[in-house]
């Protein structure tokens, strides 16, 4: 894939600066990071029972895991849109992390892999992140078929980007039973 102007890769060390600054690696088993694969397409969803239960959705891109904290379990019903708050990039090694982050540390709580697999962008993913709409196909144990991340307009005083994680209407979509 040819790279367009304005879609330059950030060196992994710089991309992980915020991630590393928030952690004490002498006290947590979380990976420090640093390894890089050439254009891998892995994804992982980690159930993170922290201050509030959420699901960390991560896509491998440019040698890091682009990350969002999803407020509820991802749904394969296109009518169920999930709020996904953009978080700092994580190292690729984090895709295999399961364990407990100690109390008093950033993200304290239990982390367990909920789903993992491969992802395929439906358009240039760097452009999609920049424009605020990223469309892709997932091939995981639980999450399959077409999905999209759509950035919401930023509200005053918001410090992080809010996105929606949405299941596309396809043969992998299911309608949730309504009460």
Where are the model-predicted features located?
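A charge-rich, low-complexity, intrinsically flexible signal that marks solvent-exposed coils, linkers
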Residues: 1-179
């Amino acid at each position: 894939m040819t790279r367009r102007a304005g879609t330059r890769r950030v060196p992994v060390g710089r991309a992980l600066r915020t991630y590393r600054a928030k952690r004490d690696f002498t006290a947590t088993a979380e990976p420090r990071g640093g390894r890089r694969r050439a254009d891998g397409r892995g994804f992982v969803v980690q159930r993170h029972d922290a201050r509030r239960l959420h699901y960390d959705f991560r896509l491998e891109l440019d040698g890091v895991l682009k990350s969002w904290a999803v407020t509820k379990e991802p749904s394969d019903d296109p009518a169920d849109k999930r709020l996904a708050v953009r978080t700092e990039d994580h190292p690729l090694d984090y895709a295999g992390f399961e364990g407990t982050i100690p109390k008093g540390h950033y993200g304290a709580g239990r982390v367990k892999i909920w789903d993992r697999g491969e992802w395929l962008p439906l358009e240039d993913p760097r452009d999609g992140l920049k424009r605020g709409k990223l469309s892709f196909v997932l091939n995981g144990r639980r999450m399959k078929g077409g999905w999209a991340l759509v950035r919401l307009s930023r509200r005053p005083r918001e410090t992080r980007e809010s996105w929606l994680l949405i299941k596309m209407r396809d043969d992998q979509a299911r309608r949730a039973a309504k009460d």
